[in-house]
Regions:
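Polytopic transmembrane helical bundles with strong interfacial aromatic enrichment
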Residues: 1-141
């Protein structure tokens, strides 16, 4: 994935979760039945909006840092994919878990949230630790 594509996808993800926050605020303000009168649904929609938005902005920072730190392209591509997919899994997992919840617990989609969080964490740690001359395990550069 190119640096430009990573930045564009990061900003698109931020716009998506920002729009979701505006929609959620409107639903709360209008007291829309079915959307926000259910406390568990409302909580998980808020979690998805907040986590997705923050992690999308984190991706903007990662996109910038990868260029500034001269991260090798083989590493940078893996990091870009991991952090973007991780942000989508965390935000989307919370939202989908809230929309498909049972009587007392979130729905099964929330199970992807920890995997997404680990992907983002791994990408940020790799961004911090990988140096310009480092090779990707397996010998590719």
């Amino acid at each position: 994935m190119s640096p430009e594509r990573h930045l564009r996808w990061s900003l698109a993800l931020a716009a998506l979760f920002l729009a979701m926050g505006l929609w959620l605020e409107a639903m709360i303000g209008l007291r829309a039945a079915g959307w926000v009168d259910d406390p568990l649904r409302r909580e998980f929609l808020r979690l998805g909006h907040a986590h997705g938005g923050v992690l999308a902005l984190l991706n903007v920072g990662v996109a910038w840092a990868l260029g500034q730190l001269e991260t090798p392209s083989a590493w940078a591509g893996k990091i870009r994919r991991a952090t973007l997919l991780g942000a989508l899994l965390v935000g989307g997992g919370f939202v989908a878990g809230g929309l498909t919840h049972g009587p007392t617990d979130p729905g099964p989609p929330v199970l992807v949230v920890p995997a997404g969080a680990l992907m983002v964490l791994g990408g940020v740690v790799a961004t911090a630790l990988v140096r310009p001359g480092d090779r990707v395990p397996g010998g590719s550069r």
